[in-house]
A protein has these predicted regions:
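Catalytic Walker B motif of ABC-type/P-loop ATPase nucleotide-binding domains
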Residues: 24-27
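Conserved H-loop
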Residues: 53-59
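Conserved signature/switch motifs of ABC ATPase nucleotide-binding domains
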Residues: 1, 19
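Conserved beta-strand-loop-alpha-helix hinge in the C-terminal portion
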Residues: 78-111
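Conserved catalytic segment of ABC-fold P-loop ATPases
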Residues: 68-75
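ABC ATPase nucleotide-binding domain "signature motif"
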Residues: 4-10
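Helical segment within the ABC ATPase nucleotide-binding domain
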Residues: 38-53
Length: 132
């Protein structure tokens, strides 16, 4: 039998929790999933986080995902010599549902604030790839 992409992600998340380290590093863990499975996995992560209370370092290129999941979003500059260009507290109520929180006016305000600073970096990265 083969596991679906979503089930493989669940197994990987369970393996990370079993190791029982204080820090859980997740580098774009849901990027290959369809939207519906992705939202289920994001809600699973939030539920498990609230239960186990580990520190999670979650790397993503998806600003909405970052805001929906995080208590803090750190934005890096584009390019190989990336540096921190922004650090934003996410003060949205918990527990959260990742689909519902996106409809919150506070979510949209946070998104606009971060996007104002991030947009220039996105354009720089895009221009670099076009120049190749």
């Amino acid at each position: 039998h083969q596991l679906s992409g979503g089930m493989r992600k669940r197994v990987a998340l369970a393996q990370n929790l079993i190791v029982n380290s204080e820090l859980l590093l997740m580098d774009e863990p849901f990027s290959a999933l369809d939207v519906q499975t992705r939202q289920i996995m994001e809600n699973d992560l939030l539920r498990l986080w609230s239960e186990f209370r580990k520190t999670v370092l979650f790397v993503t290129h998806d600003l909405e995902e970052a805001i929906a999941l995080a208590d803090r979003v750190v934005v890096l500059s584009s390019g190989p010599a990336a540096r921190v260009i922004g650090d934003y507290p996410i003060e949205l109520p918990r527990p959260r549902d990742v689909a519902e929180v996106r409809l919150d006016s506070g979510f949209m305000n946070i998104y606009r604030t971060i996007w104002q600073h991030l947009h220039g970096e996105v354009k720089k990265a895009y221009e670099r790839t076009r120049a190749r």
